[in-house]
Each structure stands twice: as C-alpha cells, then as structure tokens.
C-alpha cells in the first residue's frame, strides 16, 4: 500500500494525502483526520508519518566514497541541502545494480526519506519509486521512467583531444580502468573526429584503480620502448600515478610527456604539475538535480519527466607541450 493507493481509496488527491502526513496547514483538520484514520486502519500510518521529524530527508546513493569526484558531489549536495534546511543520508552501492535497486526500494517503501538521488545509476529497473527520485548520470533507458541529469564528457574530451592536436600531438595514448569505459568511448570518438590514429599499443585498461592504475598503466607503456607524446587519463588520480612514475625516472611533465586528466579534482592543483583536466561542472548538476527533486517532493502531482544534459569542459593549464615549436 502506497500514498497513491491511499489517495484512490479516500478520494483525495495525492497532493492532499501527502500534506496530511507532513502536518501542512494547507488542508483542513477534518480532511486530515479522514486520511489519517484510513491510513491507520490500513496499517500504513507509521510508514508515512513525517511529523516525528520535520526536516526533509534526502537519501543519496553513491557508488563509493573513495573517489574525489564522488566526494566533491556529496560535498555540494550536503552544502545545498543544509542551506535549504534539509538533511542528507548517504548509502554506498559499490557500483552494484542489485544493491542500488535494494536501497531504492528500502528508502522508497519505509518512509525513511522524502526523496532519492542516485549517482551514476546502474539499475535498469522500470519500476517507479514510491517517492520522488532523480538519477545523476544513468543508463540510456532510465530517462523513460525517471528524471535524469547527465554529464556529457564527450564535449570536454573532444576539446582536450583538439587541444593536443593543435599542439602537434599525433601519438596520443589512453589510460583508464574497467569503471571508466564511458570515457574510453568518448576518447575513441574524439580521436576519430580529429582523424587521429588510435594505436592499440598506446591504450591501457588497468585492473588497478586510482594512482596505481596510472603508475602501473604507464609502466606497461614504458616497458614497450614506444611511448606516445601525450596521455589522456580517465581521471586525475590516474594522471597523478603517471606523474609519480615519471618522477621516478627523472622525467618531467610536459617536457617529456604531455598529460590531460579528467574530473578536475582539487588535489591535482596541490602537486607540482599544473594539470589540464576535464571539468564535470559538479555544482551545476547538483543544483539542477535538487531543484527537480525538491519540486516533486513539494508538489506530488507534478509528473513531468526531465532529461537534462550538462556539458563538461576542458580546463587548459600547463601540462601539454607545444610540439609545433620544436
């Protein structure tokens, strides 16, 4: 039994039923009493009673909390929600579609949250959540049944590859890992668009993650004695791992190798290298996601689905050498 079914049974709109549980003064006491009485008869009063905790609770499902990219997103969400007088609760999905679906069901059905945000959604379930839900970066078919906010990494990566080409680079490599195949696809598209040869010898998909992926990935290229002049890394931690390897070999960026990262994390600016990177515009995607979610929480009858794409952008710094000046 959910609020929509209670709405049908009592004859009141879904918005009115929701207001009865939130303690709203916008409906009469008589109307509220009828709805609450029926809810108690049906055994769902405790499930939906929100008066025990007046602040709005937003459940955020996140693949992990080790990555700076995800912690940046969570930090923005916490900041914005605090400013709006709301509370965030975070659950980790471990990149698992089944775990994600279980958490959606948990928060949706037990009244523990008013709305849900799913970061990098993996679940392909077509079921509607019983409470408002927004996907932040989702699979292609998700927009058919849920609001989706997606980052277009293709745009920023295309800008990055164009920057490398304009600076005379033809031998461009890629280092990523199994969880970054979307960026690998974007890299391939960008290389093809600019008519640049993709050398399989310059592509590494590492089993390791973070700095280890960059260090071990570039070591594999180094051992082949046939290096590219530039490397695009799926995220900045990978780029930092490449830099660590180069420093051990007493090589410098960009003199000996040009590097571009992705996600534009703050930690990259603390290193000696002023790393060029792809910015995901985290602030924008968080603000848009919450705007849509809070609107639907406050107005349950609002059913319009939105599919918003936010472009990434290439942030040029000083980690690319201009080969045209040689």
Positions of PLM-derived features:
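Short beta-strand segments enriched in small/hydrophobic residues
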Residues: 16, 51-66, 163, 171-177
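Flexible loop/turn connectors
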Residues: 219-326
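N-terminal helix-turn-helix DNA-binding module of bacterial transcription factors
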Residues: 1-54
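Short beta-strand elements in bilobed, periplasmic/extracellular small-molecule ligand-binding domains
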Residues: 81-93, 173, 188-212
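Short, solvent-exposed amphipathic alpha-helices that sit
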Residues: 69-83, 156-159, 179-197, 213, ...
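Hydrophobic alpha-helical segments within soluble ligand-binding/sensing domains
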Residues: 147-174, 211-220, 239, 280-298
């Amino acid at each position: 039994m959910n609020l929509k079914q209670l709405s049908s049974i009592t004859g009141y709109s879904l918005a009115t039923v929701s207001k009865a549980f939130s303690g709203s003064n916008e409906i009469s006491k008589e109307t509220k009493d009828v709805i609450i009485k029926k809810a108690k008869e049906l055994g769902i009063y405790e499930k939906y009673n929100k008066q025990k905790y007046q602040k709005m609770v937003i459940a955020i499902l996140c693949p992990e909390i080790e990555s700076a990219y995800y912690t940046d997103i969570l930090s923005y969400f916490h900041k914005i929600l605090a400013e709006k007088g709301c509370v965030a609760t975070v659950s980790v999905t471990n990149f698992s579609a089944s775990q994600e679906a279980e958490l959606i069901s948990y928060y949706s059905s037990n009244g523990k949250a008013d709305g849900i945000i799913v970061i990098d959604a993996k679940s392909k379930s077509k079921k509607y959540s019983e409470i408002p839900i927004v996907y932040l970066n989702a699979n292609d078919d998700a927009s058919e049944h849920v609001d989706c906010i997606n980052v277009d990494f293709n745009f920023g990566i295309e800008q990055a590859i164009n920057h490398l080409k304009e600076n005379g680079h033809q031998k461009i490599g890629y280092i990523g890992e199994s969880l970054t195949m979307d960026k690998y696809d974007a890299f391939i598209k960008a290389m093809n668009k600019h008519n640049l040869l993709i050398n399989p010898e310059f592509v590494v998909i590492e089993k390791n993650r973070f700095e280890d992926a960059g260090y071990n990935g570039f070591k594999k290229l180094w051992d082949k004695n046939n290096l590219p002049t530039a490397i695009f890394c799926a995220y900045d931690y990978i780029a930092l791992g490449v830099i660590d390897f180069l420093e051990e070999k007493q090589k410098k960026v960009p003199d000996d190798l040009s590097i571009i990262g992705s996600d534009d994390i703050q930690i990259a600016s603390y290193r000696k290298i002023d790393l060029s990177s792809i910015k995901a515009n985290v602030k924008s995607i968080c603000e848009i996601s919450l705007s849509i979610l809070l609107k639907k929480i406050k107005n349950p009858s609002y059913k319009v689905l939105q599919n918003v794409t936010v472009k990434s952008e290439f942030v040029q710094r000083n980690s690319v050498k201009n080969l045209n000046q040689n």
